């Protein structure tokens, strides 16, 4: 798949890879290498200039705009800047994807509470995001991404603003969800973090081109 922006800047050039079912991989590269662009293409936030992306047997590059919400039911997204609603409680932020789906209040209460409990945030359910630390806000973003039990989670620099201890704990959380059957792509420039988990395959983007890095995923 390729992606060019106005002015001719080539963000991605003939990127070709396969994410196995229930696999967790790292996507590395310097700032501006195309990591965020690739994640946006996978969840149909942007369209490729050329090529196809297949997810669950469907070519999502051909998906109609009206069908994108159905696609995103199966894809959870963790943003680098959290993108929390600052005037809503932690509970309501996590519940948002379920409310968009018109889930029942009983399901919302049960699944949001379970997600917050899993991430150690149940006691923060009534707090506003501004009352939380950066690490806690990041975990709220993760809870929101997984509350719909997606098949795939895309995480864009999820440890970018965290200290090493919190970064490690965040990765442990992703690995727990991965063991539960969720496929995960983590975009990060933190090589130390990647090297601490060599069991996961690593792909690197450089000037829009992707290659698999040897020595990972053994």
Task: Go through the PLM ranges and name each one.
Residues 6, 60-76, 179:
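ABC ATPase NBD coupling module
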Residues 43:
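Helix-to-loop junction immediately C-terminal to a conserved catalytic motif
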Residues 51-59:
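Conserved ABC transporter NBD signature motif
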Residues 88-95:
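Short coil-to-helix segment of the ABC ATPase nucleotide-binding domain corresponding to the Q-loop/switch region
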Residues 128-132, 136-138:
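Conserved ABC ATPase signature
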Residues 147-151:
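A short, proline-enriched helix->beta-strand linker immediately N-terminal to the Walker B motif
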Residues 153-156:
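Catalytic Walker B motif of ABC-type/P-loop ATPase nucleotide-binding domains
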